[in-house]
UniProtKB/Swiss-Prot annotation:
Origin species: Homo sapiens (Human)
Location of this chain's protein in the cell: Endoplasmic reticulum membrane
Motif Di-lysine motif: where in chain: 308-312
Gene Ontology, cellular component aspect: endoplasmic reticulum; endoplasmic reticulum membrane; extracellular matrix; fatty acid elongase complex
GO biological process, one term: long-chain fatty-acyl-CoA biosynthetic process
Name of the protein: Very-long-chain 3-oxoacyl-CoA reductase
Keyword Lipid biosynthesis: yes
Enzyme type, top EC level: oxidoreductase
Entry comment describing in which tissues the protein is expressed: Expressed in most tissues tested. Highly expressed in the ovary and mammary. Expressed in platelets.
Listed EC numbers: 1.1.1.330, 1.1.1.62
Catalytic function, reaction form: a very-long-chain (3R)-3-hydroxyacyl-CoA + NADP(+) = a very-long-chain 3-oxoacyl-CoA + NADPH + H(+); 17beta-estradiol + NAD(+) = estrone + NADH + H(+); 17beta-estradiol + NADP(+) = estrone + NADPH + H(+); 3-oxooctadecanoyl-CoA + NADPH + H(+) = (3R)-hydroxyoctadecanoyl-CoA + NADP(+)
TM annotation in the entry: 4-24, 182-202, 271-291
Xref: CDD domains: 17beta-HSD1_like_SDR_c (cd05356)
Amino acid sequence: MESALPAAGFLYWVGAGTVAYLALRISYSLFTALRVWGVGNEAGVGPGLGEWAVVTGSTDGIGKSYAEELAKHGMKVVLISRSKDKLDQVSSEIKEKFKVETRTIAVDFASEDIYDKIKTGLAGLEIGILVNNVGMSYEYPEYFLDVPDLDNVIKKMININILSVCKMTQLVLPGMVERSKGAILNISSGSGMLPVPLLTIYSATKTFVDFFSQCLHEEYRSKGVFVQSVLPYFVATKLAKIRKPTLDKPSPETFVKSAIKTVGLQSRTNGYLIHALMGSIISNLPSWIYLKIVMNMNKSTRAHYLKKTKKN
């Protein structure tokens, strides 16, 4: 009986310690969530980082919304996309609405010989924020060997989703390091957090963006440069082929308004509270369950697409 008493006391303290630890973890998580998703860090985004923001893929969707949001915060904006007509239109809209200076650079990120032109266009600018947003995905989920025009898709997706991030960072980062301030926001994807079969190349390129961002943040945060990996799930954009926004599929404007608050607070973010909850749940699923669910979903989407195109 006497020997059982110390054991009971030990178990009591183990239990009490566990409860206290869990309570602290929950309290910290709630505090962090309130700080990020409630209060945010909008005040840290603006000309204080540098006069200019540079946004790639800036004529539609998330990129356009970032350009507008940064202009709203008083930053001059360089818009970089493929279509000169669209660039001129968005540039005019931003100038008129936010009363800030804009510049445009028309290039196709599928090409590799564009970066001298971009370098010339950015010369002499004090760049505080770079948003690497330009990207491409699949037309529809497909098995790797059956992707139409596979050779071209491989080249384009690497150039647009990977090379652009590296080269734009190479152009802009030195000025930020020299001034000891700046932020690079790399738009990855929820598809980059875990493997997505039938979107294999896209998923892999977005994983690159995520890892590149995390590594770069560790390398340069001591030099005053904040690098963020943004991992959205579905947003109602042309790229995602979603027309109507919902709670879990927000408009680009809603998503960016939320994501901009996380700059300086989260170096890796889903950008939007509902997406953060989705990411937490998905990341904690056993991998075999997750892969089975995603494979079945994408097989269903593939079958629907092929049936629809066959009818047409």
